[in-house]
C-alpha cells in the first residue's frame, strides 16, 4: 500500500498536551520560509481532500488548526503566495518549493479565525497527534483504486483513528451551528 502519511505509516506518536508551539519551515535548502506558532494545534487530522498539501508519495495530508493570532510569518514571507484565491482556505505556499505553510480563511466561514497548518514541517516534538481521518473517499477522485479504499480505512482503524468522508462529528456540528445562527434559526447566544 502507498504511504498514508509519514506521521501515520509507522505508528502515531502521542503529542504533549502542554506543548506550546514551534516553528514550521518550507523545504527550500536555504532562505526557508519560517512560520512561528505560539500554540499547539487542535483538531489535527489526516485529510484526503485534493486541496491540502501532502508530502511526496503520501495519500493524505495531516493538518490541524491554530488561532490566527497564534501564527506569524517570521522569515522570508516574501516567498509566500496564495495557491488558489477562489478557495475558502487561502493556502499560502512557498513560491520556490511549493510547500503550503498555512491556510487562512478570509471570507465569512465557520472556521474563520483559525489557520490550517501541517506540523510535520516542524523540527519540534510534542504537537497534537492526528485525531481522525477526514475526506477519506476523496482520494478515489484523485486516482486511488476504489477497490483498495477499505485497506486504507483499516490502516487508520489499526492506528486508532476513526474515518469520515466529511469532517469529524464535532466539526460538522460547529459548521451546522454556525449556519443555523447565520440563518436566524438558532440563537446567536448558545
Swiss-Prot record:
Catalyzes the condensation of formaldehyde and glutathione to S-hydroxymethylglutathione. InterPro entries: CENP-V/GFA, Formald_GSH, Mss4-like_sf. Pathway: One-carbon metabolism; formaldehyde degradation; formate from formaldehyde (glutathione route): step 1/3. HAMAP family: Formald_GSH. It holds the Pfam family GFA. PROSITE patterns: CENP_V_GFA (PS51891). Belongs to the Gfa family. Binds 2 Zn(2+) ions per subunit. Zn(2+) 1 binds at residues 26, 28, 94, 97. This is Putative glutathione-dependent formaldehyde-activating enzyme. Its cofactor is Zn(2+). Residues 19-165 form the CENP-V/GFA domain. Zn(2+) 2 binds at residues 47, 49, 52. It catalyses: S-(hydroxymethyl)glutathione = glutathione + formaldehyde. GO terms for biological process: formaldehyde catabolic process.
